[in-house]
């Protein structure tokens, strides 16, 4: 936050970021994000940071915010263990309290043990209320998601990428991220149009015999607007010193 405050107004075009997720890891740094005692404190802190990001963005700039949800503790596993008892490979949460036995609170008002906290949408709504334009919720689907030792719910395999803008009109290059039209759609578009359907009368201005002719290749789109479910495999963090490669 302090570094952001040193940047001038409307300095950058776009911000792509993934802040530390709530209650997931302890990076061992004083004042780190994600170690707040309540989800509300976490949301408020990120809202304050991204308010400064909005100031730094150009008037037609955008923010692409990657975030995932967290679960309230069930009282089992590493959630209930002291720092000394937790497996180092997990790098899981512990309170910034100097007490080595301090653990993450297992529940909060309105959130029961084992509940999904709902961090992504709470954060999105907080940003919208703070002045951002909430434009899209992109689902990042992970084909190689990590397995989970759970028996009472599906394994998590996606995260959210929220597209937010500073203004109602902003720079967005649709063509740059357009995707190919499905081959089956291309083949279907090559076919002649028949008048033996309930939609035939809707073909205004066309001669009846023209409805049976194959369509011109120039009329067939080869690209379509990018969809909001993206299947992207994650990368290994080995050799990079970072636990959340994307």
Model regions: which residues?
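Core catalytic lobe of class I
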Residues: 1-246
């Amino acid at each position: 936050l302090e570094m952001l405050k040193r940047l001038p107004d409307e300095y950058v075009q776009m911000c792509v970021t993934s802040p530390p997720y709530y209650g997931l890891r302890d990076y061992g740094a004083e004042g780190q994000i994600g170690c707040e005692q309540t989800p509300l404190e976490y949301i408020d802190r990120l809202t304050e940071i991204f308010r400064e990001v909005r100031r730094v963005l150009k008037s037609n700039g955008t923010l692409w915010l990657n975030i995932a949800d967290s679960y309230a503790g069930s009282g089992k596993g590493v959630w209930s263990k002291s720092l000394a008892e937790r497996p180092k490979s997990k790098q899981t949460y512990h309170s910034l309290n100097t007490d080595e036995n301090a653990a993450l609170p297992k529940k909060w008002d309105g959130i029961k043990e084992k509940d999904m906290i709902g961090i992504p949408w709470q954060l999105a709504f907080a940003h919208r209320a703070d002045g951002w334009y909430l434009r899209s919720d992109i689902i990042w689907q992970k084909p190689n998601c990590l397995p989970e030792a759970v028996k009472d719910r599906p394994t998590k395999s996606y995260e959210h990428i929220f597209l937010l803008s500073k203004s109602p009109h902003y720079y967005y290059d649709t063509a740059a991220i357009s995707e190919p039209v499905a081959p089956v759609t291309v083949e279907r578009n090559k076919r002649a149009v028949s008048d033996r359907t309930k939609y035939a009368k809707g073909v205004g201005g066309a001669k009846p015999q023209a409805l049976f002719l194959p369509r011109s290749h120039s009329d067939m789109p080869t690209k379509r607007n990018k969809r909001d479910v993206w299947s992207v495999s994650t990368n290994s963090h080995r050799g990079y010193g970072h636990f959340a490669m994307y």
